Amino acid sequence: MTDFWQHGMITTLQKLRERPVGELEAELKAIARRRKLVLLLPALYSEFETPSMPRIIEELKGVEYLHRVVLSLDRAGRNEFEKARGFMSALKCPVRIVWHDGPRMKKLYRELVRNDFSMDHPGKGRSVWMTLGSILAERDVYAIALHDCDIVNYRREMLARLLFPVAHPALDFEFSKGYYARVTDQLYGRVTRLFYTPLIRTLRRILGFNPFLSFLDNFRYALSGEFALISSLARGIRISPTWGLEVSLLSEVYQRASINRICQVDLAETYEHKHQ
């Protein structure tokens, strides 16, 4: 469900027509010869036991422009880790797994705690922060995309559309945020509809003009778990383990990137994920 509305300070890239995914991927494949692109997948092992993760892996088999896929795996014992590794081995591109419940990662967390660096908040924020560090250790990675692993109707076009604005040299964006329609016969997107948007707009009415609140209000789906950014931006951001990753990341991007280098991208006409 697309439109032509450019409604504020954030550039909105709508899905105005069905461009074949093969065309997008061909351009990304050419770009990837000069700019290495990495996909970060934060996942719980339980998501491998749902229809969503096998579908995501099946779709990613057709992606040829990624330098690497990095799985950030949480809540997995040894047997679960081996099963997840078996699933991921089906991909054609190199795969790295950061196993947060594994002995080496646990040893690292204990070492950090001993040195007064609190790691007491396991969750998506901590998982992404640690995994980003391992990706950024490769100094020649140009851009990183991240999306959730509970997308039931995942298509590889979503990844291509998410990465394209930050990867393409003619567009010059540093950060892209995914959005999508949540129009069904049920009230999905409740946290955004009933909490996030009313809260932000109430604060704007109470406080008057505030550029940061205007920035947050300009995203069509601020709580979406899909974004891509260039590695130079990723190196400077702080990721909070205690607050929502999605909103805290927008706060960091607001402070560190020029507004005209931030965009939001229409990823899909419909979007369905695992509901809580």
Predicted segments — roles?
Residues 1-62:
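N-proximal low-complexity "stem/linker" segments adjacent to membrane-targeting elements
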Residues 55-67, 86-87, 167:
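Short, acidic, metal-binding catalytic loop of nucleotide-sugar glycosyltransferases
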Residues 78-139:
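Active-site-proximal specificity loops/subdomain of glycosyltransferases
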Residues 138-152:
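Short beta-strand-to-loop acidic/aromatic patch adjacent to the donor-nucleotide binding site
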Residues 151-181:
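Conserved donor-nucleotide/metal-binding helix-loop-beta segment in metal-dependent transferases, i.e.
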Residues 182-193, 204-226:
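A recurrent flexible, glycine/aromatic-enriched loop bordering the glycosyltransferase active site
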Residues 233, 242-259:
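A short, conserved alpha-helix in the catalytic core of glycosyltransferases
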Residues 263-276:
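Active-site donor/metal-binding and catalytic loop motifs
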